[in-house]
Amino acid sequence: MPLNVSFATNRNYDLDYDSVQPYFYCDEEENFYQQQQQSELQPPAPSEDIWKKFELLPTPPLSPSRRSGLCSPSYVAVASFSPRGDDGGGGGSFSTADQLEMVTELLGGDMVNQSFICDPDDETFIKNIIIQDCMWSGFSAAAKLVSEKLASYQAARKDSSSPSPARVHGGCSTSSLYLQDLNAAASECIDPSVVFPYPLHDSSSPKPCASPESSAFSPSSDSLLSSNESSPRASPEPLVLHEETPPTTSSDSEEEQEDEEEIDVVSVEKRQPSTKRSGSPSAGGHSKPPHSPLVLKRCHVSTHQHNYAAPPSTRKDYPAAKRAKLDSGRVLKQISNNRRCASPRSSDTEENDKRRTHNVLERQRRNELKRSFFALRDQIPELENNEKAPKVVILKKATAYILAVQAEEQKLVSEKDLLRKRREQLKHKLEQLRNSCA
């Protein structure tokens, strides 16, 4: 049943209705028109009554007021359970001094300070109703909790001594009212650890705070376990949020621990953030992967540039190039053997080295052959000024030119022989003439 309290003085209208507002109007057969006719001249429209009948509490609960006043839910509950006056009316029969004295006695008692305010280990205070169910726990539940505390306090007050009248002083009552308002705010607030119960910088299991300030507003371990089990997203993954690696399952973590012993080329790039933290154990594995893509890029050479039109006899004309090729091949083979002895290489790496060596030697052979063709072209009179002459034309013209030169040589040699014979004849004739004259 809702709590209806009215004060004669110092009434705060902005919080009274919210603090005592019920979930529904309990009496479903209540005649609103008859009540309105008794208080007002004209009844309200039926639509207003319908919406007022089904009016709910605001969800989520409103933030508590931070100002000191007499309209907090705890004080309303205190006033509602206080002894009523002789006239049988509401709380309006009490004066302001009596109300302040009751609140001061409630907050100043030793039992209340130990069990309700200053005892953070109390299970009743830790397991707050608002924290257990923050959606539908209204002020009636908070008033019920205060009433239970008040009943136990009144039972213990009979045995204890009465408080001194000096506590009804104005300054003390103001501070006690402010503490009462803060106490009401603490009971109505929601702990942020319920929304996100996992710590960001603690890799171990979640522990409750050790300080009394934080423990007073933190839920118990049972409530944390129940919230973790009930939530579908609860998993041990968020417990390692401080690490740099992404959250993985237990099977993945076991596989990564086994893979750290044997590091291959494929898995190094996948576990690069973790190997950076490890340091020296994975230093040898990081040197291989950056070089392998570069080797593949450099070894990609098209094979359609070979000179298939050149006759096989041209290689016999250039024994120096072939000798250099064989020598460089031996040197590179020795280098590859030394590397193989120093560190075991895979078959792919060996094939890449062989392909790279072959490409270098083939490029050198083509360059030397091109320079030879250019030199031969310059010796042919017909192709001396033709820079775009193909290699086949150069070879044909060179062959014809060589044959012509050889024929010319034979002709000149025969002519030389004839001239030598003529000379010999002339010499012999000259000798005969000298002998005849003598």
Swiss-Prot record:
Keywords: Acetylation, Activator, Chromosome, Cytoplasm, DNA-binding, Glycoprotein, Isopeptide bond, Nucleus, Phosphoprotein, Proto-oncogene, Transcription, Transcription regulation, Ubl conjugation. The keyword Coiled coil does not apply. GO terms for biological process: chromatin remodeling; chromosome organization; DNA damage response; G1/S transition of mitotic cell cycle; intracellular iron ion homeostasis; MAPK cascade; negative regulation of cell division; negative regulation of monocyte differentiation. GO terms for cellular component: cytoplasm; nucleolus; nucleoplasm. InterPro entries: bHLH_dom (IPR011598), HLH_DNA-bd_sf (IPR036638), Myc-LZ (IPR003327), Myc_transcription_factors (IPR050433), Tscrpt_reg_Myc (IPR002418), Tscrpt_reg_Myc_N (IPR012682). Pfam families: HLH, Myc-LZ, Myc_N. This is Myc proto-oncogene protein. Glycans are attached at T59. Its main location: nucleus. SUPFAM superfamilies: HLH, helix-loop-helix DNA-binding domain. Disulfide bonds: none annotated. A motif (UBR5-degron) lies at residues 354-363. Residues 412-433 are annotated as: Leucine-zipper. Residues 201-364 are annotated as: Disordered. Residues 314-330 have a biased composition (Basic and acidic residues). Residues 353-405 form the bHLH domain. Transcription factor that binds DNA in a non-specific manner, yet also specifically recognizes the core sequence 5'-CAC[GA]TG-3'. Activates the transcription of growth-related genes. Binds to the VEGFA promoter, promoting VEGFA production and subsequent sprouting angiogenesis. Regulator of somatic reprogramming, controls self-renewal of embryonic stem cells. Functions with TAF6L to activate target gene expression through RNA polymerase II pause release. It is found in: Nucleus, Nucleoplasm; Nucleus, Nucleolus; Nucleus; Cytoplasm. It comes from Sylvilagus floridanus (Cottontail rabbit). The modification N6-acetyllysine is found at K144, K149, K158, K276, K316, K322, K370.
